[in-house]
């Protein structure tokens, strides 16, 4: 069908490539099923048994090939397959005139991501990157406070995302030839994207990666030092080798007028704990450097599932012909930042963007 939806369309008809994994755990049940402006029509996965199970579970058609999926009556495709398959699958979808929402990272390399973006532009289809954490309501509330100047001049931001990810046979995140990298590209891409949402674009990066605990080819540890274009600094730390319950996935945002501190807002859940410490007046110098207590307030807007918000926002952009809120420019920029981080880790130098 044409890439342009009819004006009378009430719901975007979706297909999914890679129906297991994150699609089955999160995006289908939490995003597509309750979405008011989207309908899941068909799914395809390289594992036929998995695909049949998912199709039965969510009452969708089970396509027996990528070609069959693209021949179905669908408007858009959500790509949730392993990263090494993204490039060829996205190009096939673009040739078929299907709009695309692709999981991050877009590809293993900048060249792959650029090829995908160009193919979608030539085909006239929308191409989005699935950075769903942008839709977390506490993150959006924090961004609004910063945009209003409540934090003052941005000074420093930190984002952490960690989990325990032991060696698993054929796990693409554990082999850079398949996933492009390890903890950094898988989780650090979310963290850096969020910090740029708060503080603006990154100007330079310095990065260290390591295989600290696990012996698989990808890094299980990464720390990045960021310099933003506005002069603020930041750090991102991601680990596949810290037990889940030991890490609170911290988010820390500091400015000349205060701070916003959070735990567990970064991740697949839709709500954590976020507190703002924003004194009304600019503080004078205190020689004793006392720390006032009880001056913070909770940032606790009504939570909304991030996967649902993501699917509805992208679908609304298609139906209403509005700007894509998850533009592929965001994903391509993220890919370039990740490449700079890995180059820094390899060379021991700061890399300018």
Residue ranges of model-derived segments:
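C-terminal glycine/acidic-rich active-site capping loop/insertion
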Residues: 11, 132, 228, 251-329, ...
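Predominantly a Rossmann-like dinucleotide-binding segment in NAD(P)-dependent oxidoreductases
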Residues: 133-216, 223, 348
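N-terminal Rossmann-like dinucleotide-binding module
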Residues: 1-57
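Hydrophobic residues in well-ordered beta-strands that form the structural core
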Residues: 24, 64, 79, 101-102, ...
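Basic phosphate/pyrophosphate-binding loop/patch that engages nucleotide-derived ligands
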Residues: 118-126, 140-155, 254-258
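C-terminal helix-rich "cap/oligomerization" subdomain common to oxidoreductases
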Residues: 1-11, 16, 76-79, 313-353
């Amino acid at each position: 069908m044409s890439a342009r939806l009819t004006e009378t369309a009430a719901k975007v008809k979706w297909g999914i490539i890679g129906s297991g994994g994150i699609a089955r755990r999160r995006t289908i049940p939490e995003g597509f099923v309750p979405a008011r402006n989207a309908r899941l029509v068909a799914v395809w996965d390289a594992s036929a048994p998995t695909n049949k199970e998912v199709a039965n579970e969510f009452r969708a058609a089970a396509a027996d090939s990528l070609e069959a999926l693209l021949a179905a009556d669908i408007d858009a495709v959500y790509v949730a397959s392993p990263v090494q398959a993204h490039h060829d699958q996205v190009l096939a979808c673009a040739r078929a005139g299907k709009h695309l929402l692709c999981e991050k990272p877009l590809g293993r390399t900048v060249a792959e991501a650029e090829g995908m973006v160009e193919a979608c532009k030539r085909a006239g289809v929308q191409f989005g990157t699935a950075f769903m954490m942008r839709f977390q309501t506490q993150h959006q509330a924090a961004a609004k406070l910063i945009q209003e100047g409540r934090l003052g001049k941005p000074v420093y931001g930190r984002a952490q995302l960690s989990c325990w990810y032991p060696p698993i046979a054929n796990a693409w995140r554990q082999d850079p030839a398949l996933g492009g990298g390890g903890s950094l590209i898988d989780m650090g891409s979310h963290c850096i994207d969020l910090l740029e949402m708060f503080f603006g674009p990154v100007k330079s990066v310095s990065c260290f990666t390591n295989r600290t605990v696990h012996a698989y080819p990808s890094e299980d540890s990464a720390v990045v030092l960021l310099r933003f274009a506005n002069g603020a600094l930041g750090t991102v730390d991601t680990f596949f080798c810290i037990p889940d319950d030991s890490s609170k996935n911290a988010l820390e945002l500091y400015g000349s007028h205060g701070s916003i501190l959070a735990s567990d807002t970064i991740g697949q859940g839709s709500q954590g704990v976020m507190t703002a410490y924003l004194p009304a007046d600019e503080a004078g110098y205190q020689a004793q450097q006392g720390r006032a207590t009880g001056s913070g307030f909770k940032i606790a807007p009504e939570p909304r599932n991030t996967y649902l918000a993501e699917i509805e926002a992208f679908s609304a952009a298609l139906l209403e012909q509005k700007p894509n809120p998850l533009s592929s420019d965001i994903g391509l920029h993220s890919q370039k930042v990740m490449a700079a981080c890995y180059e820094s880790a390899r060379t021991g130098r700061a890399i300018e963007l």
